[in-house]
């Protein structure tokens, strides 16, 4: 939905190009995720483990790619994730597509850059403990990123936020957003941990029927354990609207 709402922020001169393609932009925003298991270099484009580089605001990390490579080496950087740099490369590709008037690439890169920008706004995409695997909180990544919006976004979140503004220094902008995500990661984890003390497991989790995916039989439903509605609402409230705020900012 991020790409969908982003279209409506565009000036009229761009809206005439993007609005007729709004479904393409929405549907193909997930293409980078689909590539993660087929393209070895895809995974690091979605995250950066900022805690690997010390503490906020991580002054040791060069913001420019060539300087970062000179300091850490390309292999080391890719191991820890490269999302802030990859977004800038995607922006260059998109700019070149506009210059050459290659409309198919304009749509492809527009759809995909929206995905990477959204990832950069997710706190656990800027933290090595990306799914709570180090703190016995496995599943928290999908909880913050999917479960909370799934239950609350359509009815409670406001995604109409005025008109788009030109960003003069996109490199600085995306790094600031990544640093915000890294700073918020501990809150995402600690809030879930604190709230879990107030909920027994039978209240924290619920079993729900979901449509089967991928290798399962088409149309088949499967029962999965999911964070309960009550726990999800309480978590969102305790976070002070962080999920909505980060989603709005990613638009």
PLM region spans:
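Short active-site segment of divalent metal-dependent hydrolases/proteases
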Residues: 118, 124
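Divalent metal-coordination and catalytic microenvironments
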Residues: 115
